[in-house]
Regions:
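Membrane-embedded alpha-helical bundles of multi-pass transporters/translocases
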Residues: 3-246
Length: 247
C-alpha cells in the first residue's frame, strides 16, 4: 500500500476474560432488578408498610448518591494494592451488597412500624449509596484498567449488556413464581433474597478474577497509537457514574 504501514492495536484479553468480566453484570443486576422491581411489593404486601412513606424514604436515601459517587471514585483513584485499584472495591463491595440486600428483604415482622421503616432506610441507604456505588464504579473503571485496546473495551461492554439484559429478564420472569413456590410471606422473600445474594457473590467473584489490571507503568505507556485520549481518567468515570441510574 505504497509504504503505508497499518499498525494493529495490541491485544490484552482472551475471549474468556471478556466473558468473565461480563458476568459482573449478573451480580449487579441481581441487586438492581430484584430491588427495583420487587421491594415495594414486599414492603407493602408482606411487611405492611405504607407505600407513600417508603417512597419518601427512598427519595431521601438517593440524596446521598452524588456524594458517595465522588467519594468512591476518589478512593479508587488513590488505591494501591496487589489486586490493583478497582478490583478490591468491586470484590469486597459486593459482599456489602449481598448483606444489605438480604437485610432489606429480611425486616422482622415482630418490630413496630417505626423500627421497620428505620430498618429499611438504613439497609437501603447502605446498599444503594455505599456498597452498590463502590462496586459499580469499580466495575465500570475496569475497562480502562485491564486493556488499552479500544475494540476490546467495546467487546467488554457488549458482554456486559448481554448479561445485564438476560439477568433482568430472568429476575422479572421467575421471582414471583419462586416466592409462591416457597410458600409466600416473609420467609419466602428471605429465601429468594438469599439465593440471589449467593448468585451475585459467585458471579461478581468470577468477574473480579477473570481480569487483571495493568500496572501504572503500562497505563502510562503511550506506545499504542490513538491511546492518548483513552488514558485512565477517574474524573470522567465519576461524571458518567453520577448520571447513571441508581437502584
Amino acid at each position: 500500500m505504497k509504504g503505508e504501514i497499518l499498525m494493529e492495536e495490541k491485544t490484552y484479553l482472551k475471549w474468556y476474560n471478556k466473558v468473565g468480566y461480563g458476568t459482573g453484570d449478573i451480580a449487579g443486576n441481581v441487586v438492581y432488578a430484584f430491588l427495583s422491581s420487587f421491594v415495594m411489593i414486599y414492603l407493602t404486601n408482606t411487611v405492611g408498610l405504607n407505600s407513600g412513606i417508603v417512597g419518601t424514604l427512598i427519595a431521601v436515601s438517593k440524596l446521598f448518591d452524588g456524594v458517595t459517587d465522588i467519594f468512591f471514585g476518589t478512593m479508587i483513584d488513590h488505591t494501591k494494592s496487589k489486586m490493583g485499584k478497582a478490583r478490591p472495591w468491586m470484590f469486597y463491595g459486593f459482599f456489602g451488597c449481598a448483606i444489605t440486600l438480604f437485610g432489606v428483604f429480611a425486616i422482622p415482622t415482630s418490630l413496630g412500624k417505626t423500627a421497620q421503616y428505620a430498618w429499611f432506610f438504613i439497609a437501603y441507604t447502605l446498599l444503594n449509596a455505599v456498597f452498590y456505588t463502590a462496586n459499580n464504579i469499580a466495575y465500570a473503571a475496569l475497562t480502562s484498567l485491564v486493556t488499552k485496546n479500544s475494540k476490546e473495551r467495546v467487546q467488554m461492554g457488549s458482554f456486559r449488556f448481554m448479561f445485564s439484559f438476560g439477568t433482568n429478564l430472568v429476575i422479572q420472569s421467575v421471582t414471583v413464581g419462586a416466592v409462591e413456590m416457597f410458600g409466600g410471606g416473609a420467609t419466602a422473600w428471605r429465601t429468594i433474597a438469599f439465593i440471589y445474594c449467593i448468585i451475585g457473590i459467585i458471579t461478581n467473584t468470577l468477574a473480579v478474577f477473570s481480569v487483571k489490571e495493568l500496572s501504572d507503568e503500562e497505563l502510562k505507556d503511550d506506545s499504542v497509537a490513538g491511546e492518548e485520549d483513552d488514558k485512565l481518567s477517574f474524573k470522567k468515570i465519576i461524571k458518567l457514574q453520577i448520571g447513571r441510574a441508581h437502584v
